[in-house]
Amino acid sequence: MACMKLGSKSDAFQRQGQAWFCTTGLPSDIVVEVGEMSFHLHKFPLLSRSGVMERRIAEASKEGDDKCLIEISDLPGGDKTFELVAKFCYGVKLELTASNVVYLRCAAEHLEMTEEHGEGNLISQTETFFNQVVLKSWKDSIKALHSCDEVLEYADELNITKKCIESLAMRASTDPNLFGWPVVEHGGPMQSPGGSVLWNGISTGARPKHTSSDWWYEDASMLSFPLFKRLITVMESRGIREDIIAGSLTYYTRKHLPGLKRRRGGPESSGRFSTPLGSGNVLSEEEQKNLLEEIQELLRMQKGLVPTKFFVDMLRIAKILKASPDCIANLEKRIGMQLDQAALEDLVMPSFSHTMETLYDVDSVQRILDHFLGTDQIMPGGVGSPCSSVDDGNLIGSPQSITPMTAVAKLIDGYLAEVAPDVNLKLPKFQALAASIPEYARLLDDGLYRAIDIYLKHHPWLAETERENLCRLLDCQKLSLEACTHAAQNERLPLRIIVQVLFFEQLQLRTSVAGCFLVSDNLDGGSRQLRSGGYVGGPNEGGGGGGGWATAVRENQVLKVGMDSMRMRVCELEKECSNMRQEIEKLGKTTKGGGSASNGVGSKTWENVSKKLGFGFKLKSHQMCSAQEGSVSKSNNENVKIEKLKDVKERRGKHKKASSISSER
């Protein structure tokens, strides 16, 4: 730290308790009281340097007191600063530094220590040191600005605060790698390929290491928030990038709000400052609340500028500190703008409501999701734009537009599964949150099915109608085979949903089996061609006839094993469907009076139930699969007949050839 030495005399001041004495051999003729400290000094050194002291001593002398008493209660810097002022008046050695120059400059102005009362007076000395030394250094400017807090009114009047902020903003807006600072100021290491170093202030080839854009975060976080806010405002006016400004705001917030330090070393930490250092002054709850609200207003409303985790932490602290409703609403809106970048742990927030109706703050998550959906509809080319649609269960649209909504759908499904065990969570809240996600956003409904199953498990008292209404959110066509298998055996699901699941699972299996038959038939035809015609192709094509034949045989065997397992599964499902059909027929008989109904009535009841469940196309699909299987078997029989005819023709040809040879003999 730079300094400037003043005076040449040895220190003649001694402290005894709450009093300072000047041991020059002459008795003291004036007592100056500054706060709780008293200074026993001499009149001449003081009045020869200060206009205020000259007037006060003259007024005291008129009263005829031999030893006058002067009280100074509003001196900038207090008794510590007056000690340095007194030493300057006596010509005692002292050092001007970046830490005390602001106090001395303000005190000199207050005491009117101008050039009229002595050449090289304290005002000119401090002004020269401040302008020519302090403002030329980042570190010294930070220390000087930090000291302005206690004398802010005087510092503003003398433009000291403004000069410090302008100097800091200028250096922060300039690429530090162009000039070698602030690495040199911070004592950073040097790169020297040839082993050269800095010698006598002259660079001999050494280069400072590359400095990241966040090098000033820690120094700026030492300032009080009013000064920090003024510094950030000037930096923005100088064109510093918004992401750098946002990074400094998040760093400052994490340092001064203890509740935000629970996640250390997260992805939001960057550069050489992995975690903010602790602050010596702990803010009160009211000060923390005010700081949080101020920071929230300073941050730009721009997606991706600040990590979502930071906003989630701020929202949690805002609810603990009971911040204003506007602050909480803005934080929820910010999270909603970039909800696709959030993690599941970010949304699992405890409820801080006085009523404590639920364990988790589901209402806040609902509002966040609504903000995301609303922002998505407004933004051009968003995931909710008309260009994204669903056609026959397949998503149509660019991957860039589908990805955010799909990620949010997966996130909300995970959140629903997380909060489902809460017995206090009402069905309307759970159902409303699940229904907020558009249908096209879920590629599979497995996550939603899992959440509903957990909710039904922990809410066994729900009525059958409530269960059916909740399960209507499921699209059975979007369930995977594993989910269908689990749902078919799930006793918590309504009967209507189980029938739908079994039907669609059977339909999927029939389609898969039919496809396997077609593939197997094609492979059988190819293998027969290989057996009849041998390997056709050049020496460089493929890997030989034997390798191709073996591969085809292996694939055919694998497909046959798969078809066998599918046939068994289809048979099991058909048995289950027939059993359920009988049960439904019995239900239909009982509703009609309990009489014995004919098979026609039972089948008619089943058809009615199928229509209600949306199974109108079942027969058509079944006929299609049966026709497909019939065509496959028919083609197989025709192939067998053709092979037999070929064998008969070959035998006849061989017999004719043998008979002709014998006749010639």
Curated annotation (Swiss-Prot):
<dbReference type="InterPro" id="IPR011333">
    <property type="entry name" value="SKP1/BTB/POZ_sf"/>
</dbReference>
<feature type="region of interest" description="Disordered">
    <location>
        <begin position="260"/>
        <end position="280"/>
    </location>
</feature>
<feature type="domain" description="NPH3">
    <location>
        <begin position="214"/>
        <end position="508"/>
    </location>
</feature>
<comment type="function">
    <text>May act as a substrate-specific adapter of an E3 ubiquitin-protein ligase complex (CUL3-RBX1-BTB) which mediates the ubiquitination and subsequent proteasomal degradation of target proteins.</text>
</comment>
<dbReference type="GO" id="GO:0005886">
    <property type="term" value="C:plasma membrane"/>
</dbReference>
<feature type="region of interest" description="Disordered">
    <location>
        <begin position="626"/>
        <end position="665"/>
    </location>
</feature>
<feature type="compositionally biased region" description="Basic and acidic residues">
    <location>
        <begin position="640"/>
        <end position="650"/>
    </location>
</feature>
<dbReference type="InterPro" id="IPR043454">
    <property type="entry name" value="NPH3/RPT2-like"/>
</dbReference>
<keyword id="KW-0833">Ubl conjugation pathway</keyword>
<keyword id="KW-0175">Coiled coil</keyword>
<dbReference type="Pfam" id="PF00651">
    <property type="entry name" value="BTB"/>
</dbReference>
<dbReference type="InterPro" id="IPR027356">
    <property type="entry name" value="NPH3_dom"/>
</dbReference>
<feature type="modified residue" description="Phosphotyrosine">
    <location>
        <position position="449"/>
    </location>
</feature>
<comment type="pathway">
    <text>Protein modification; protein ubiquitination.</text>
</comment>
<dbReference type="Pfam" id="PF03000">
    <property type="entry name" value="NPH3"/>
</dbReference>
<comment type="similarity">
    <text>Belongs to the NPH3 family.</text>
</comment>
<feature type="compositionally biased region" description="Polar residues">
    <location>
        <begin position="626"/>
        <end position="639"/>
    </location>
</feature>
<dbReference type="InterPro" id="IPR000210">
    <property type="entry name" value="BTB/POZ_dom"/>
</dbReference>
<feature type="domain" description="BTB">
    <location>
        <begin position="28"/>
        <end position="98"/>
    </location>
</feature>
<dbReference type="GO" id="GO:0016567">
    <property type="term" value="P:protein ubiquitination"/>
</dbReference>
<protein>
    <recommendedName>
        <fullName>BTB/POZ domain-containing protein At1g30440</fullName>
    </recommendedName>
</protein>
<dbReference type="GO" id="GO:0005634">
    <property type="term" value="C:nucleus"/>
</dbReference>
<feature type="coiled-coil region">
    <location>
        <begin position="281"/>
        <end position="306"/>
    </location>
</feature>
<feature type="modified residue" description="Phosphoserine">
    <location>
        <position position="279"/>
    </location>
</feature>
<keyword id="KW-0597">Phosphoprotein</keyword>
<feature type="compositionally biased region" description="Polar residues">
    <location>
        <begin position="271"/>
        <end position="280"/>
    </location>
</feature>
